[in-house]
Curated annotation (Swiss-Prot):
Main function: May be involved in environmental stress response.
UniProt name for this protein: Zinc finger A20 and AN1 domain-containing stress-associated protein 6
GO process annotations (BP): cellular response to hypoxia
Chain positions recorded as Zn(2+) 3 binding sites: C125, C127, H141, C143
UniProt: Zn(2+) 1 binding residues: C16, C20, C32, C35
Domain of life of the native organism: Eukaryota
InterPro entries found in the cross-reference section: AN1-like_Znf, AN1_A20_ZnFinger, Znf_A20, Znf_AN1
GO molecular function: DNA binding; zinc ion binding
Organism: Arabidopsis thaliana (Mouse-ear cress)
UniProt-annotated stretches for the region Disordered: 53-76
SMART domains: ZnF_A20, ZnF_AN1
ZnF (A20-type) residues: 10-44
Binding site for Zn(2+) 2: C111, C114, C132, H135
Amino acid sequence: MAEEHRCQTPESNRLCVNNCGFLGSSATMNLCSNCYGDLCLKQQQQSSSIKSTVESSLSVSPPSSSSSEISSPIIPPLLKNPSVKLEVPEKKAVISLPTTEQNQQQRPNRCTTCRKRVGLTGFKCRCGTMFCGVHRYPEIHGCSYDFKSAGREEIAKANPLVKAAKLQKI
């Protein structure tokens, strides 16, 4: 009877393998998004710890019993002059960017022709000015933008002229 009515549970709705109560996905190894994120973080931490142990093992030089002449480290220090100081750039908060965005949002957009407030429903023409729904057409507001030459340039860029080499007659 279950075959007739197809009352089987779909394979995509499986519970998480960790039994956390959420649904898992086959794309995330039958884990829910929370458990999968935790798994990814653990893998990244393990890989970073492996890298640090490899780097530390490479930086330690093997002890040499017969050669007492080598007293300097294998890798010379990058900075031998102590009077030169390294400048570490500090994180500075960029305040000018949000203020310009706020100024643009606070400034009311008005139609250039009738000075009607348009807000978000305004239309910006290719000539660079803002218009309302009535004056948005180039014929109505006397647009100075040359649509024909712009169209020709776009077509020329999209379809470059392909010139084949001439065939020589035998």
